[in-house]
Curated annotation (Swiss-Prot):
Catalyzes the reversible adenylation of nicotinate mononucleotide (NaMN) to nicotinic acid adenine dinucleotide (NaAD). This is Probable nicotinate-nucleotide adenylyltransferase. One of its GO terms (biological process) is NAD biosynthetic process. It comes from Cronobacter sakazakii (strain ATCC BAA-894) (Enterobacter sakazakii). It comes from the Bacteria. One of its GO terms (molecular function) is ATP binding. SUPFAM superfamilies: Nucleotidylyl transferase. It catalyses: nicotinate beta-D-ribonucleotide + ATP + H(+) = deamido-NAD(+) + diphosphate. The keyword NAD applies. Pathway: Cofactor biosynthesis; NAD(+) biosynthesis; deamido-NAD(+) from nicotinate D-ribonucleotide: step 1/1.
Length: 219
C-alpha cells in the first residue's frame, strides 16, 4: 500500500492594496479548475517591484480578513507582513517547502503579467524548484511570452493536465483558463480618490473599512 500524496496547497501573494473582487473571483475560478480546496493569501509588507502600498500592513491585513471571512476556500498567512525587508517570493516558498516536506505538491498563484517577467524575478529558478506556478489570465496581457527564447524556456515546463500539479511536488507552470476580470487596485484607488462608486468592485465589508478609515483619499 502506497502513502497517499498530500493535497495540492496553493498560496496567493500580493500587496492587496486593497483586496478586491478581481483577486477573489479569479482565484475562486482557478480553485474550481485546478481542484484546490484551500488557498492561502499571503500579503507582502515591502513589495520589491512596485511602490509602497497606500494602506499600512495592518490595514491591508484587516481588509483581507474582512474579505475572506466566512469563506472556507481562503485562509491568511501573515509571515511576509512581519518582515522589514523586501518580500522575495522565492525565499518565502523555500521556507514553505521546508515546512511541507519534499513530496507535498505546492503552488504559487500569479497573473499572466507576472509570468511575462518571471525570468527577471529574484531567484526565479529556486521558486520553481519549490513549487508549481498557477497562472491566471489578466486583461490586456498576451498569452505568449515576450521573446522566442522565453517561449522556448516555458514550453517544457508547461503542465498539460491538472493531474500533473497534484502528482508532482513542484516545477510545473499551469496556464489556467480563468475569466478575465477588468478590475485593478490602481483603478479602485483612483476611483476612491475621486469619490466614485466602488460598490461592485469590493466586498461590502472592505469598502466600509476603507470609508471608516478614510483610506485612499487625496492628500
Amino acid at each position: 500500500m502506497t502513502d497517499r500524496i498530500p493535497a495540492l496547497q496553493a498560496w496567493y501573494g500580493g500587496t492587496f492594496d486593497p483586496i478586491h473582487y478581481g483577486h477573489l473571483r479569479a482565484v475562486e475560478a482557478l480553485a474550481r479548475e485546478v481542484k484546490l480546496t484551500q488557498v492561502t493569501i499571503l500579503p507582502n509588507n515591502v513589495p520589491p517591484h512596485r511602490p509602497q502600498p497606500g494602506a499600512s500592513s495592518l490595514q491591508r491585513k484587516a481588509m483581507v480578513e474582512l474579505a475572506i471571512a466566512g469563506h472556507p476556500l481562503f485562509r491568511l498567512d501573515t509571515r511576509e507582513l512581519q518582515r522589514a525587508t523586501p518580500s522575495w517570493t522565492s525565499e518565502t516558498m523555500v521556507q514553505l517547502r521546508l515546512e511541507a516536506g519534499p513530496d507535498a505538491p505546492l503552488a504559487f498563484i500569479i497573473g499572466q503579467d507576472s509570468l511575462l517577467t518571471l525570468r527577471t524575478w529574484h531567484n526565479y529558478e529556486a521558486l520553481l524548484a519549490c513549487c508549481h506556478l498557477l497562472v491566471c489570465r489578466r486583461p490586456g496581457y498576451p498569452v505568449e511570452m515576450k521573446t522566442d527564447e522565453d517561449q522556448r524556456w516555458l514550453a517544457p515546463r508547461l503542465a498539460r493536465h491538472v493531474d500533473e500539479l497534484h502528482r508532482e511536488p513542484a516545477g510545473k507552470i499551469y496556464l489556467a483558463d480563468t475569466p478575465l476580470y477588468p478590475i485593478s487596485a490602481t483603478d479602485i484607488r483612483a476611483r476612491l480618490a475621486s469619490h466614485q462608486s466602488c460598490d461592485d468592485l469590493l466586498p461590502p465589508a472592505v469598502l466600509a473599512y476603507i470609508q471608516r478609515h478614510a483610506l485612499y483619499r487625496p492628500a
